[in-house]
Curated annotation (Swiss-Prot):
A GO BP entry: translation
Cited Pfam families: Ribosomal_S10
InterPro entries according to UniProt: Ribosomal_uS10, Ribosomal_uS10_CS, Ribosomal_uS10_dom, Ribosomal_uS10_dom_sf
Protein's gene: rpsJ
GO molecular function terms attached to this record: structural constituent of ribosome; tRNA binding
Lineage per the UniProt record: Bacteria, Pseudomonadati, Thermodesulfobacteriota, Desulfuromonadia, Geobacterales
Official protein name in the record: Small ribosomal subunit protein uS10
Oligomeric form and interacting partners: Part of the 30S ribosomal subunit.
Function: Involved in the binding of tRNA to the ribosomes.
Family in the record: Belongs to the universal ribosomal protein uS10 family.
Coiled-coil portions: none
């Protein structure tokens, strides 16, 4: 597997949880002898929702909510078989979405 690279893309609503998970992945990859590029912070997506406060009549009274999706990108260059096995066994937090491309 010397000419391949693994691209890992992580998404989460909580940036602290995301950074902890990224740290675990980077430590695991470096321990097994692979080169790591990243973590690269990708743009944060902000979804804003505007909701009427009351059930009827008052259109001018509104409440605004937003949800932020934080993203990180990690490239693992020259992964070994040990790296792949260690990443498969890694247990990350429930609030982090992980996409892996070979």
């Amino acid at each position: 597997m010397p000419s391949q690279k693994i691209r890992i893309r992580l998404k989460a609503y909580d940036h602290k949880l995301l950074d902890v998970s990224v740290g675990e992945i980077v430590d695991t990859a470096k321990r097994t002898g692979a080169r790591v590029a990243g973590p690269i912070p990708l743009p944060t997506v902000v979804n804003k929702y505007c909701v009427l406060r009351g059930p009827h009549v008052d259109k001018k009274s509104r409440e605004q909510f937003e949800i932020r999706t934080h993203k990180r990108l990690i490239d693992i260059l020259e992964p070994t078989q040990q790296t792949v096995d260690a990443l498969m066994k890694l247990d990350l937090s429930a609030g982090v979405d992980v996409e892996i491309k070979l």
